[in-house]
Design a protein with these regions (language model features):
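Acidic, low-complexity central loop/insert segments
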Residues: 64, 69-126
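The conserved catalytic core of RNA pseudouridine synthases
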Residues: 36-38, 58, 149-191, 196-199
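Glycine/acidic-rich beta-strand-loop module
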Residues: 42-72, 128, 141, 145
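Accessory RNA 3′-end/elbow-binding domains used by RNA modification enzymes
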Residues: 1-45, 49, 53, 115, ...
């Protein structure tokens, strides 16, 4: 029987959806599935995740799509498995092997030294199969067409790179690792560079993102769980409370913000949530000079109750 339930309007259904992405599907596939499950076209993602990777993918639904660009998602955490003993064209298991190295003489101490050298503030050359654009085209598309891609190094911060477990075989060493890093860091490039430093070659065989900014696997649901219970993970007020500092405002101040007017600043840095006496977010606000103005009005006066 067809579903004749009307799609959400206003702030109904608005919020953030934190998906635990399965392997083998693209971020665009996830967006499409969420649009179908939630019966709305207004779904967007706050950054992608490689098809082979699993884990946290943050999406905005309905009016919450407007806050995606304001989210501070500058730190990320991953668990991964690095295989030493072979380098591949894609720096992961989906690529062709381009070289192999002998791992029999590699001591644990050398691995530890290599990991330490890739921890902290480093210059990293992104993977050649990344989504970075070169002369207007994605690097991964150029690589698939057989072109040689040279991407300049860029500064990243790897605040944690820890080996959790090691497994040795005749032709490989598998390392289960935990990585905490800045946005723009490529874990597959860490695998590549560790293998290069040890002269063994290295690539990823598994990657799972466990956190993006304040959003973790505890917030996340699989697509099957979403289909069974189609709702956002965090409504717009809960999403804002999780992601932004809070400023409580009076009813009069809330009305001013809802009408696009500014308030006096109170010295809160960055973007923060202005919350009215009813506990609902009125606007996301940023202070500039002598004004605290809205960067997004969550509940404009025209929206109604």
């Amino acid at each position: 029987m067809p579903d004749h339930t009307p799609p959400p309007s206003g702030l109904d259904g608005a919020g953030l959806l934190v998906v635990d992405k399965a392997g083998g599907v693209t971020s665009h596939d996830v967006v499409s599935a969420c649009r179908k499950a939630l019966r709305t076209r207004r779904v967007g993602h706050a950054g992608t995740l490689d098809p082979m990777a699993t884990g946290v993918l943050v999406l905005g639904v309905e009016r919450a799509t407007k806050i995606l660009g304001l989210l501070s998602l500058t730190t990320k955490e991953y668990t991964a498995t690095i295989r030493l003993g072979a380098a591949t064209t894609t720096d992961d298991a989906e690529g062709d092997v381009v070289s192999r190295g002998d791992v029999s003489g590699v001591p644990d101490s050398a691995i530890d030294d290599g990991v330490a050298a890739l921890t902290g503030d480093i210059e990293q050359v992104p993977s050649s199969v990344s989504a970075i654009k070169i002369d207007g085209r994605r690097a991964h598309a150029l690589v698939r067409e057989g072109e040689t891609v040279v991407i300049p190094p860029r500064p990243v911060t790897v605040s944690r790179f820890e080996v959790l477990q090691r497994r040795r075989s005749a032709d490989a060493i598998d390392l289960d690792v935990h990585v905490e890093c800045s946005s723009g860091t490529y874990v597959r490039a860490l695998a590549r560079d560790l293998g290069a430093a040890l002269d063994t070659g290295g690539h990823l065989t598994a990657l799972r993102r466990t956190r993006v900014g304040p959003f973790t696997l505890e917030h996340a649901r699989t697509l099957d769980e979403l289909r069974a219970d189609p709702r956002v993970s965090l409504d717009i007020d809960a999403a804002v409370a999780t992601a932004f500092p809070r400023r409580d405002v009076s009813a009069a101040e809330a009305e001013s913000l809802s009408q696009g007017r500014w308030l006096d600043p109170v010295g809160i840095p960055g973007v923060y949530a202005a919350v009215g006496p009813d506990g609902r977010t009125v606007a996301l606000v940023q202070e500039r000079g002598k004004r605290a103005g809205s960067v997004m009005v969550v509940r404009p006066a025209t929206l109604g109750p």
